[in-house]
Amino acid sequence: MAREPQRLRRRERKNISSGVAHVNATFNNTMITITDAQGNAIAWSSAGMMGFKGSRKSTPYAAQVCAEDAGKKAAEHGVRTLEVEVKGPGAGRESALRALQAVGFHITSIRDVTPIPHNGVRPAKRRRV
């Protein structure tokens, strides 16, 4: 018996004018999620999703390509203005922000939401290379 082909469900196009761009820039990767005001994800991308592997994921260029991809997906849903929340110490922080501006979004605010410990857990030992 032949199996019937699976139907691809096309996501319905939301009509959202403003959103929040969450930029998570770690030392190893850059992940960007664009959500609505309630936190429901509209579009997302990461340097690894864009085909960068290994140490290339942590470059500013990878973050730029990733931000352009997420921005284009969000623009299809009608997003025009963005608040940007940047988290982490990675190299892709500023380049992702510039790429979102270059896509054509009006950025209303930029917040740094990097978690800072109040002397939490012991840090990892120093690397000896």
From Swiss-Prot:
Q: Which GO terms describe its molecular function?
A: rRNA binding; structural constituent of ribosome
N-terminal signal peptide? none
Q: Which InterPro entries match?
A: Ribosomal_uS11, Ribosomal_uS11_bac-type, Ribosomal_uS11_CS, Ribosomal_uS11_sf
Which GO cellular component terms are attached? ribonucleoprotein complex; ribosome
Q: In Gene Ontology terms, what is a biological process of this protein?
A: translation
Q: Which UniProt keywords apply?
A: Ribonucleoprotein, Ribosomal protein, RNA-binding, rRNA-binding
Indicate the family of this protein: Belongs to the universal ribosomal protein uS11 family.
Q: How does it assemble?
A: Part of the 30S ribosomal subunit. Interacts with proteins S7 and S18. Binds to IF-3.
**Stated role:** Located on the platform of the 30S subunit, it bridges several disparate RNA helices of the 16S rRNA. Forms part of the Shine-Dalgarno cleft in the 70S ribosome.
Q: What protein is this chain from? A: Small ribosomal subunit protein uS11
